[in-house]
């Protein structure tokens, strides 16, 4: 049996809360959450996860959502270090996996610089949950040999700068985190770098949650599709030939959760798309 690791006084754990569904927490994450005396949590960590905290634990919201920041990163670093130095059992609870676009390095460095013991508990990342939700594999033997994760988040006032030539790989699946607002930029740059316009795309919002929405489209229709198909929840783009293998029946079922009026707006969008492309449907 591996050694049981608990949250000790004066220690920090960076814990992955997974994509949202509390049942996708690891057993270790659930136990660490229950042992903490203070939990600093992201905006995307839902109530179903926070309910697992000890009744006497302090819950401190330090989340960041689409430019609406409750705390800057430097302040978060100071808060978790101060709590640990005060002898608290600290859990820094992050959506998904802490080491994937989770600003883990800054918090690890801050703890180590202060002499605070710090450890990581991994979590299920959003791309895995999104793929499961649409019944697809992100890799496919002989077709999709690589998997690339990128974030479409750029600092305020700065352009999104990625190596589009490398990302436009027909033998790879591309997962774009925080990709909804940048869908047009992503599609235009990938096509300019040579990726085919009919490359399949899945837009997945609120992956793993009851309000999950799924929309299948293609790269050349992605910008219009993203404006119509999604709400205001966190969304991820999955791009690549492996998406042709998605379970479309399951996706159709999930699309029924679209908010009232979305279907009619999607139809209107497809009419506009048809005027430009001659195609009436964005589905694969």
Where are each of the predicted segments found?
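Short beta-strand/turn micro-motifs composed of small residues
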Residues: 41, 94, 122, 151, ...
């Amino acid at each position: 049996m591996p050694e049981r690791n608990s949250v000790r006084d004066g220690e920090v754990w960076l814990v992955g809360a997974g994509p949202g569904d509390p049942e996708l927490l690891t057993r270790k994450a659930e136990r660490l959450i229950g042992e903490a005396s203070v939990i600093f949590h992201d905006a995307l960590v839902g109530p179903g996860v926070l309910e697992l905290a000890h009744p006497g634990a302090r819950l401190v919201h330090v989340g960041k959502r689409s430019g609406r920041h409750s705390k800057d990163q430097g302040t978060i670093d100071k808060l978790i270090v101060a709590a640990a130095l005060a002898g608290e059992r600290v859990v820094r609870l992050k959506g998904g996996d802490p080491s994937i676009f989770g600003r883990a390095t800054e918090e690890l460095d801050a703890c180590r610089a202060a002499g605070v013991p710090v450890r990581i508990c991994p979590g299920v990342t959003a791309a895995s949950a999104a793929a499961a939700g649409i019944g697809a594999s992100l890799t496919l033997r002989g077709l999709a040999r690589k998997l690339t994760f990128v974030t479409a988040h750029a600092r305020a006032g700065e352009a999104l700068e990625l190596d589009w030539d490398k990302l436009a790989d027909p033998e790879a699946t591309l997962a774009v985190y925080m990709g909804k607002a940048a869908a047009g930029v992503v599609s235009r740059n990938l096509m300019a770098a040579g990726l085919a316009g009919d490359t399949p795309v899945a837009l997945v919002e609120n992956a793993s949650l009851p309000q999950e929405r799924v929309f299948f489209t293609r790269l050349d229709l992605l910008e219009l599709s993203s404006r119509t198909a999604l709400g205001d929840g966190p969304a991820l783009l999955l791009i690549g030939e492996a998406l042709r293998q998605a379970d479309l029946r399951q996706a159709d079922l999930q699309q029924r959760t679209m908010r009232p009026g979305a279907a009619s707006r999607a139809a209107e969008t497809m009419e506009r798309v048809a005027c430009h492309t001659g195609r009436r449907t964005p589905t694969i």
